Design a protein with these regions (language model features):
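Hydrophobic ligand-binding cavity/cleft-lining segments
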Residues: 1-44, 160-179
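Short, surface-exposed coil-to-beta transition loops
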Residues: 5-7, 57-61, 81-85, 97
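A short, structured loop/turn motif at beta-sheet edges
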Residues: 16, 44, 65-69, 88-97
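Hydrophobic pocket/interface hotspot
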Residues: 19-23, 29, 47, 63, ...
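A structural signal for short hydrophobic beta-strand segments in well-ordered beta-sheet cores
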Residues: 39, 63, 86-88
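Short beta-strand segments that buttress and anchor functional surface loops
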Residues: 47-52, 72-78
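Beta-strand/loop substructures that line and gate deep hydrophobic ligand-binding cavities in soluble
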Residues: 77-132, 137, 141, 146-150, ...
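Intrinsically disordered, low-complexity mixed-charge segments
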Residues: 141-168
Length: 179
C-alpha cells in the first residue's frame, strides 16, 4: 500500500502565537472542519479522532515534533495510519502563514490506492484547503480582543461537521450548548 501526502496553506490575519494556540485546540476542529466528527483527549500527548472521509475512520494519535508557537506534529498509533505537521510562520507582526502536510495510507488496501488515483485524494486535498480557509475566516472575523486561546466558542463555520449535526455524542458533550 502506498502513502499519500496532501498539503494546504493559508495566511491568517493574526499573530503566530494566537493562531498556534487556537489551532491546537483539536477538540474544536469539528467546529470549522467538515470531515472531522470528533476529537477527544486521552491525556496531554494523545488524542482520539473520528473522521468521515469516504466512510467513517478512527485513529489514536500522539503529539510529535512540537515547537511552541511554530510547529505541531503527530503520528497515529492505532487505526487509520497517518502522520503530519503544521507550521506557523510569522508574516510581519500581524499575520501568520499556516502550512499543513498530512500523509496517510488509504484504508481498504488496493481499493484505497485506486480511489486515491481516481480523484478521492484530490477531493480530500481541496476539502482540507477549504477547511483551512474556514479557520482563517473565523479568526479574521473574531472581534478584537476575542482571540483568547482559552475561549474558542466562536469557532463555528456553516460547513463544519458541528454546524451540520455530524459530530458524535462524545464530541457534542465537549462543546456544551455551542453545538
Amino acid at each position: 500500500m502506498a502513502e499519500y501526502t496532501h498539503t494546504a496553506a493559508v495566511t491568517i490575519n493574526a499573530p503566530a502565537n494566537q493562531v498556534y494556540h487556537l489551532f491546537t485546540h483539536f477538540n474544536d476542529f469539528p467546529k470549522f472542519m467538515s470531515y472531522i466528527k470528533e476529537v477527544t483527549y486521552k491525556d496531554s500527548q494523545t488524542s482520539h479522532w473520528v473522521a468521515d472521509v469516504v466512510g467513517s475512520h478512527e485513529w489514536d494519535a500522539v503529539n510529535e515534533n512540537w515547537i511552541e508557537h511554530k510547529q505541531v506534529g503527530w503520528r497515529s498509533t492505532s487505526g487509520l495510519t497517518n502522520h503530519g505537521v503544521v507550521t506557523f510562520e510569522p508574516v510581519g507582526d500581524s499575520q501568520t502563514k499556516v502550512n499543513v502536510s498530512l500523509s496517510y495510507d488509504p484504508p481498504a488496501g488496493v481499493l484505497g490506492d485506486a480511489g486515491e488515483k481516481l480523484g478521492v485524494g484530490k477531493a480530500f486535498e481541496q476539502k482540507l484547503q477549504t477547511d483551512l480557509d474556514h479557520f482563517a475566516q473565523l479568526v479574521a472575523q473574531t472581534p478584537t480582543g476575542a482571540l483568547d486561546p482559552e475561549s474558542s466558542n466562536y469557532l463555528f463555520h456553516d460547513d463544519s461537521a458541528a454546524a451540520q449535526g455530524k459530530t458524535t455524542t462524545s464530541q457534542d458533550s465537549t462543546m456544551g450548548d455551542n453545538a
